[in-house]
């Protein structure tokens, strides 16, 4: 398996399985001198970890991260940062019945066909449990970006099923279990989840992630465009089936006179492009949206086959999220932070001394 790393200069490599002994990652390329403690990383991990609300999986993992290397006397040294989280609440017996069956909608069949074997305990490496390490690594990037450049990266749940938000209040997001910025929609989300639990079913969701304060100039055309790397990172999140930058697929219905973002001496008058032009950050907010599918781990019976190809039926047991989009909020933040951090380091290495006569708007 070769696809365990992301980034070029700020590079994150993860390892571990859902029911293994531990999860871990190596973060390369973090500049030296950043004050960093385990508590700094724990904040976002606590936002992602399972068992924290009645709306998500009841698997209870402390997700306490340990810094193994790369930090000395409270500051990063510039060497590889090693991070580790031990798994403590595995219930592998929940998966014994699917040892020889493929869960429809999951990676069971494709992993088996590609590798000739699979870890059926919670999906092994394909499980979203792996994203805990992305969040830990992303927290390193988020702290550096905010402390050194004033860049802030935040996300929120913008839609669950047919319930969409009408407004965004950044101060409201941490006041509810849904990371919802619209207080008027919390009860509707609550009602939807309760209904799904009774039915044993699940629902999809849409997450919006925003990077504020990103300077103009990040992105490496033509193949490492900033929007291309953002899409790559967000698409790599478990259950994500679609990514939009700015207005995304709405541009199909727009005219050029509507979509273009006029420039004025005071700044851009709109942001349909989502803060990226020609693959390079424009200085506006970077705005992206991800669509997450409804999880297939449900108690509604579904058709599948056994390892020998025989027809059978499957009811998924275990502890699962009725909507995986809820806990995907800090994951989306982490992935965007990793990409912005990587491009910032790359830009500084090549274009540090570039100056133009045109004022930055």
Swiss-Prot record:
Keyword Lyase recorded? yes
Highest classification ranks of the organism: Bacteria, Pseudomonadati, Pseudomonadota, Gammaproteobacteria, Vibrionales
Query: What's the protein called, per UniProt?
Result: Chorismate synthase
The UniProt GO MF terms for this protein read: chorismate synthase activity; FMN binding
User: How does the annotation summarize its subunit structure?
Assistant: Homotetramer.
* Pathway assigned to this chain's UniProt record: Metabolic intermediate biosynthesis; chorismate biosynthesis; chorismate from D-erythrose 4-phosphate and phosphoenolpyruvate: step 7/7
**Pfam families cross-referenced by the UniProt entry:** Chorismate_synt (PF01264)
Quote the SUPFAM superfamilies the UniProt record gives.
Answer: Chorismate synthase, AroC
Give residues annotated as binding FMN: 125-127, 238-239, 278, 293-297, 319
Q: Which organism is it from?
A: Aliivibrio fischeri (strain ATCC 700601 / ES114)
Any one cellular-component term (Gene Ontology) = cytosol
Query: A GO biological process this protein is involved in?
Result: amino acid biosynthetic process
Q: Which cofactor does it need?
A: FMNH2
What is the stated purpose of this protein?
This reaction introduces a second double bond into the aromatic ring system.
Member of which family?
Answer: Belongs to the chorismate synthase family.
Textual note on the cofactor:
Reduced FMN (FMNH(2)).
**EC number assigned by the record:** 4.2.3.5
PROSITE patterns reported in the protein's UniProt record: CHORISMATE_SYNTHASE_1, CHORISMATE_SYNTHASE_2, CHORISMATE_SYNTHASE_3
Q: Which reactions is this enzyme annotated as catalysing?
A: 5-O-(1-carboxyvinyl)-3-phosphoshikimate = chorismate + phosphate
């Amino acid at each position: 398996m070769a696809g365990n790393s992301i980034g070029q200069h700020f590079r994150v490599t993860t390892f571990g399985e859902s029911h293994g002994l531990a999860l871990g990652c190596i973060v390369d390329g973090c500049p030296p001198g950043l004050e960093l403690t385990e508590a700094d990383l724990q904040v976002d991990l606590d936002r992602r970890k399972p068992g924290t609300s009645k709306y998500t999986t009841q698997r209870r993992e402390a997700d306490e991260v340990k810094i193994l290397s790369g930090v000395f006397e409270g500051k990063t040294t510039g060497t590889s940062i090693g991070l580790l989280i031990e798994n403590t609440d595995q219930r592998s017996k929940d998966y014994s019945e699917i040892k020889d069956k493929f869960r429809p909608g999951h990676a069971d069949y494709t992993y088996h066909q590609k590798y000739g074997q699979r870890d059926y305990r919670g999906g092994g490496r394909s499980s979203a449990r792996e994203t805990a390490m992305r969040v830990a690594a992303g927290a390193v990037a988020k702290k550096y970006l905010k402390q050194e450049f004033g860049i802030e990266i935040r996300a929120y749940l913008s839609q669950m099923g047919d319930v969409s938000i009408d407004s965004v209040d950044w101060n409201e997001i941490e006041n509810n279990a849904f990371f919802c910025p619209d207080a008027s929609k919390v009860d509707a989300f609550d009602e939807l989840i309760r209904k799904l639990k009774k039915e044993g079913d699940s629902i999809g969701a849409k997450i919006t992630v925003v990077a504020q304060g990103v300077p103009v100039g990040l992105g490496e055309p033509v193949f490492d465009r900033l929007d291309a790397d953002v899409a790559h990172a967000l698409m790599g999140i478990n259950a994500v089936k679609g990514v939009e930058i700015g207005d995304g697929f709405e541009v199909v219905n727009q005219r050029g006179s509507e979509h273009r973002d006029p420039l004025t001496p005071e700044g851009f008058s709109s942001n349909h492009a989502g803060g990226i032009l020609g693959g390079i950050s424009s200085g506006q907010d970077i705005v992206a949206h991800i669509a997450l599918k409804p999880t297939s781990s449900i108690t509604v019976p579904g058709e599948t086959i056994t390892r020998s190809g025989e027809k059978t039926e499957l009811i998924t047991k275990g502890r699962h999220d009725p909507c995986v989009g809820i806990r995907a909020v800090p994951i989306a933040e982490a992935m965007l932070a990793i990409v912005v951090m990587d491009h910032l380091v790359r830009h500084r290495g090549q274009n540090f001394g570039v100056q133009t006569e045109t004022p930055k708007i």
